[in-house]
Structures are given as C-alpha cells and as structure tokens.
Amino acid sequence: MFQKKFRYMAAVLAALMITQGSFTAFADEIGPGYDEQNKASTDTSVTDPANAWKKVNGVYVDNNGKTIEGALLRGISVAKWQGDIDWAKVAADDISFAFIKMMSYGYEGGYTMDPNYEKNMKGAMDNGVQAAPYVYLQTKTVEEAKAAAKYAVEKVSGYNVKYPIAVDVESKYILELSVQELTDVVNAFCDTIVAAGYTPIVYSDYSKFTTEMDTKQIHYDIWLARYGADGTYEGRTIWQCTDKGHVNGINGNVCLEFAYKDYAPVTKGTAVDTGEWKNESGKWYFYRDGGRMSLHI
C-alpha cells in the first residue's frame, strides 16, 4: 500500500513540475512578434490584402486602402519566432526600422535572452535598418525595473542604437500590480534608460494603456499595438497595426509598425564599447569611454 501511494504521489509531483515548467516557458514567449492565439505569427492562412500597410502613390495606406495620416516610416518587430531573417531583403522592402527582442526580464533578477538578439541586431544594422531593442518586462518592483533597464543598457553597448529602447508591458505577472504600482515600474525603467543617454518607449495594447496604467504620469513615447485601421492615441509615436504582415526576407507573418516620428536624427544613443554602471556612495552612475555619463535616477 505504501509503495502504491508513494508511486502515485511521485507521479502527481512530476506532472506538476512539467506543468509548471511549461507555464514558465509560455510566459516568457509572449511579446511583439508573437501571436498568443496562433503561437508564433507564422500562420499565413490569414493575411491582409496585398497592398495593405504599404506605400501606394507615395503615401502609406491601411488595410482598407486609406491613407495613414502622419506615417513617416515603415518598420517591423521580430523575435526568435521569425527564425533566420534575410535582412538585405527586409531593407529592400521599405523597412526602415526594426524592434528586436533582447530579453525577457523577470522578478528576482531572472532573465532570458532572445537567442537571435545579437544576430538580428547586427543583420539589421549592417543593412541600414535602424535597430530598436525591446525588453519583455515581468518585474514587480521599481528596483527590479531599474535593474532590468541597466542590464538592457549594457546589452546595447557596442551597437549604434538611435531608435528607442522599448519596454514591453503585457506580462500577466506585471499586470497583477495596481495601476499606480505598474505606472511606477514603467517610469522607473524609462527613467533609467534616459539616465544612460538613450530614448525609451513604452509598448502595450490599447486596453492595457487605458486600464492598467496611468499614461498621464508616463511622460514617454507610446508604442501602441492596436490592430486595424485606427492607430490614434495620445503620445503614440509608433503604431503596431497588424501581426499578419508580410515582408520579403521573413518566412510567415510579421508585426508591422509605422513611425510618426523619425528618431534617428535626435536620439543620443551611440556605440559604446566600455559602458558600465558603477555604484559610488550609494548612487549609480553610467560610465562611457572612461568618463561618468549621468546619474542613475
């Protein structure tokens, strides 16, 4: 009898461990470039019209053929789900910028780098596509958000990043916070990015921007995910219009973006070979090329 009970308990424990492991992995996969319902955004059974989200007669048009007022540049967002990307073909298909997944950063300092991050950063930049890293944030405290941002700054060292470093706010874990708590976490991440001399941007969908955080307290640019023909939102400088786009050089569907602001001429981020954070008398400073750059807020 004891042996039977032991075997039963062991089987239950093993099942729980497998379930927990699968759940953790799934939580790490969501983000731009990932279709939660269809897993990776590679299902080509549903696509937009052939001329949707492209430049027609000198202007960008939506999936109904209407002009996208104010759209300056077309871009994409990618992660490991897009596999090997031919960046030369991407660049030739009127793609000016790309949000590239850097990592998922969780609570208690845990993080997972996207395996294609460095390859995609180099591929984009080598072909004239502005690369913009994004971090899928799962932190629950201000201090953890600051740590995530500092690590992100270290991981862009060596790249000539001119577009924003994005914080992806959609994890179910981070959404357990109150509106004020989540707003504070987002601001902490962005403040730290600014302190290092880079430009931050906040990614989420319309529902979360309007119900989960107080955007009136977030004085940073908005990267809005709202699929269809309405990308208007206060503070929105980049609009993710669809996850069913198609771009040469990428197998399957990909998220398409439109920029209403060209960051390249104004962003302060530059290639950094020796950038690092140092704690001096309880305060954090970022050093570039041997000199102190700015105070960590």
Predicted regions and their residues:
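Glycine-rich, charge-decorated loop segments at or immediately adjacent to ligand/cofactor-binding or catalytic sites
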Residues: 144, 208-216
